UniProtKB/Swiss-Prot annotation:
NCBIfam families: PRK01151.1
UniProt keyword annotations, A-Z: Ribonucleoprotein, Ribosomal protein
Signal peptide: none
Gene Ontology biological-process entries: translation
Pfam families: Ribosomal_S17e
Gene: rps17e
A GO term for molecular function: structural constituent of ribosome
InterPro entries recorded: Ribosomal_eS17, Ribosomal_eS17_CS, Ribosomal_eS17_sf
Gene Ontology cellular-component terms listed: cytosol; ribonucleoprotein complex; ribosome
Annotated Gene3D superfamilies: Ribosomal protein S17e-like (1.10.60.20)
Name by which UniProt lists this protein: Small ribosomal subunit protein eS17
Family statement: Belongs to the eukaryotic ribosomal protein eS17 family.
Length: 70
């Protein structure tokens, strides 16, 4: 089973994906830099948690696109 992420991670991550989807990828390191620029989280840990969830959401979107084309 995976981790349960709190609302203070999910909400900003969803907003970032909604507004800046064209700048995001499935690469955590790249998303970490985007989150740092866009959201300015207070701590590194929070930045990484948000970037991790953003990466998760982007992978889900990619899978949905692939399944939709088959």
């Amino acid at each position: 089973m995976g981790k349960v992420r709190p609302t203070f991670v999910k909400r900003p991550a969803r907003e970032i994906v909604e507004k800046y989807e064209e700048y995001l990828t499935t690469d955590f390191e790249h998303n970490k830099k985007v989150v740092e620029i866009v959201a300015r989280p207070k701590t590194k840990k929070l930045r990484n948690m948000i970037a991790g969830y953003v990466t998760h959401l982007m992978r889900l979107k990619e899978r949905q696109r692939e399944e939709g084309t088959e």
